[in-house]
Amino acid sequence: FYIGGMGAKSTNFHKELFIRMGYEEEANKIQDLFMEGKRDEAARVLPDQLADDMALIGPKDRIRERLQAWRESKVTTMLVATTDKQTLREISELF
């Protein structure tokens, strides 16, 4: 929704962010499909790599391996999305 439908077609912060991340072709296609009312088709354009670039996903060891790059980036806030207490404990150990 954010890439395709937030703001005006010519002014969309989220689309511009994904373009800066190297996903220009996909961002343009997503927005075009979204504007045509083809939301499901637009969602299928999202590459799996984009999710991996945007989030620390996977087992604890994989997150640990990738966390240093995030610490060295411009990221200032991280969100943990889980309701599982054990997962929260494990993630807190990484910090």
Residue spans for each PLM region:
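A structural motif corresponding to the C-terminal end of an alpha-helix
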Residues: 69-76
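Hydrophobic faces of well-ordered beta-strands that scaffold small-molecule active sites
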Residues: 52, 76-81
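An alpha-helical appendage that flanks or caps ligand/catalytic pockets
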Residues: 1-69
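C-terminal helical cap(s) of enzyme catalytic domains, especially alpha/beta-barrels
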Residues: 84-95
